[in-house]
Amino acid sequence: MAAITAALVKELRERTGEGMMDCKKALEKAGGDIEKAIDDMRASGAIKAAKKAGNVAAEGAIAVKTDGTSAVLLEVNSQTDFLALQDDFKNFVAESLEEAFAQKLTDAAPLIASREAAREALVAKCGENVNIRRLVRVEGDVVGAYLHGNKIGAVVVLKGGDVELAKNIAMHVAASNPEFLDSSEISAEAIEREKNVFLQLNADKIAGKPENIVENMINGRITKFKAEASLKEQAFVMNPEVKVGELAKKAGAEIVSFTYFKVGEGIEKPVDDFAAEVAAQVAAAKQ
């Protein structure tokens, strides 16, 4: 029997999302075999959906489906990346995506309702919280999509051009994550905020300089900010000598919209202090 070390318990905890003591017991039962412990924990089915409903699900997968004139981009979350790689989770995501695409759903609410029974069954089987988080459907003359692994997805709608161009621009979106379509969408508040940040970060460099020099420095930073934040003004990742907007224009196309999803984006993940948890468990055991 392999020794049940703290490192082994920590690894099992990170891979399954279960509590420290549950992981320790599972390892003891499995004779220190972490893979067997995982299989036993999944097979036990003792962890119910209700128990896991409050747990933060910030891992998971992005999925996308397109037919060239429409697309659905979907995010489904799990507690651990381990589950996101399992067939049961992948099947749930695939079935959810197919339903959303076939029914032309435009938001997640009806999909969440119709898939609730399947979600609860998955949670009961795998012992993790699972959530359908968000969904976007787009339509247009030309629609392209790109999926990077199962963690980042992007869709682009064009007027004119072809699917290959739309897909290439979607790949650029996935790589660069622009904030705006073009600089006209950038609000005065956003520009003012960028200006203030620049002034704070460069206070020492600016001190004592003539007003016109400072103004030129600010304008240079704002110009750079607009280029970095705007899709049409970004350098195309596959050919940095060409801006994305120019690429589309040369192909007789206009970029209408883009959507970017990244797994767990905006979800606050709990920060685990493993040493503190061990100390708390030991203290509780002594009482």
From Swiss-Prot:
A Gene Ontology term for the protein's cellular component: cytoplasm
Annotated region described as Involved in Mg(2+) ion dislocation from EF-Tu, given as residue ranges: 80-83
CDD domains: UBA_EF-Ts (cd14275)
GO MF annotations in UniProt: translation elongation factor activity
Pfam families (alphabetical): EF_TS
Keywords: Cytoplasm, Elongation factor, Protein biosynthesis
Main location group: cytoplasm
Recorded superkingdom: Bacteria
Stored PROSITE patterns: EF_TS_1, EF_TS_2
Compartments (UniProt record): Cytoplasm
InterPro entries: EF-Ts_dimer_sf, Transl_elong_EFTs/EF1B, Transl_elong_EFTs/EF1B_dimer, Transl_elong_Ts_CS, UBA-like_sf
Function as written in the Swiss-Prot or TrEMBL entry: Associates with the EF-Tu.GDP complex and induces the exchange of GDP to GTP. It remains bound to the aminoacyl-tRNA.EF-Tu.GTP complex up to the GTP hydrolysis stage on the ribosome.
Family: Belongs to the EF-Ts family.
Name this protein carries in UniProt: Elongation factor Ts
Gene: tsf
